[in-house]
C-alpha cells in the first residue's frame, strides 16, 4: 500500500564507488500515512580525508566528521530507524549501493525493498527534460535548501514523494504493484518504475551484527 511506512533518505559520500569510497553523512525522514513523522541526521567518520571536490560540493569537511561515529556504529542505528519501512531515494541505485555494500562489509543480514523517485518523476512528470532533485523540486514548487546536504535532500525528496503519492491516488493507484503496471503502460514514460529488492546475507557468523 502507498500508505505503508517509508523511509526517504540521502547519503553524502567521499566518492562514487561503494567499494572504494565511504559514507560521510546520512539523512532520512520517516513517512507514515503521507506525513513526515520522524527524522534521522548524522555525520559519519569515514576514517579517510574528505576530498576537496567533495568538500566543495557538500560543504562537509574533515573537522565536521572527525568526532563523529564510524559506519560500524551508525549503520545499525539507521537500519533500526528504517525498520519495517520501504526505502525511498532520488536515484536510489547510488544510495542503496553504499548501504548494501556496508551491510555486506559489516556482516549485517538485511532484506530491502526500495523505490526510486527518479522513476516516479519520469512517469508522473513526463514534461520534464531532466529529473535531477532540484529540477523535480522546482516543478512541484518545493523549496530545496542546502542541496547536497543529506538531511535537506532527504526532506525535499520526502516532500516530493508525498506529492507523488497524492498524484498516484488521483490516478486510482494505491499500491506499488499497480504503480509498476501504470509505469509500464504510460506512453510518456522513459522507463518503467521498478520496485527494487535486495537481500544481504551475512557470509559468516563472525562480526555479524543483529
Where are these regions (language model features)?
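Conserved non-catalytic scaffold segment of RNase H-like nuclease domains
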Residues: 1-112, 126-148
Amino acid at each position: 500500500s502507498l500508505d505503508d511506512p517509508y523511509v526517504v533518505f540521502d547519503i553524502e559520500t567521499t566518492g562514487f564507488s561503494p567499494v572504494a569510497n565511504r559514507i560521510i553523512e546520512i539523512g532520512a525522514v520517516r513517512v507514515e500515512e503521507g506525513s513526515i513523522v520522524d527524522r534521522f541526521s548524522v555525520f559519519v567518520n569515514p576514517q579517510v580525508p574528505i576530498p576537496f571536490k567533495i568538500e566543495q560540493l557538500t560543504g562537509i569537511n574533515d573537522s565536521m566528521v572527525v568526532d563523529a561515529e564510524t559506519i560500524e556504529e551508525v549503520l545499525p542505528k539507521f537500519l533500526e530507524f528504517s525498520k519495517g519501512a520501504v526505502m525511498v531515494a532520488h536515484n536510489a541505485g547510488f544510495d542503496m549501493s553504499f548501504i548494501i555494500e556496508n551491510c555486506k562489509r559489516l556482516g549485517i543480514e538485511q532484506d530491502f525493498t526500495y523505490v526510486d523517485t527518479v522513476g516516479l518523476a519520469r512517469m508522473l512528470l513526463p514534461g520534464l527534460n531532466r529529473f535531477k532533485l532540484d529540477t523535480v523540486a522546482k516543478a512541484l514548487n518545493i523549496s530545496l535548501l542546502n542541496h547536497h546536504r543529506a538531511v535537506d535532500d532527504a526532506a525535499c525528496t520526502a516532500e516530493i514523494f508525498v506529492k507523488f503519492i497524492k498524484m498516484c491516488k488521483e490516478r486510482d493507484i494505491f499500491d506499488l504493484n499497480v504503480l509498476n503496471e501504470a509505469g509500464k503502460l504510460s506512453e510518456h514514460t522513459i522507463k518503467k518504475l521498478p520496485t527494487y529488492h535486495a537481500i544481504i546475507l551475512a557470509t559468516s557468523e563472525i562480526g555479524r551484527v543483529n
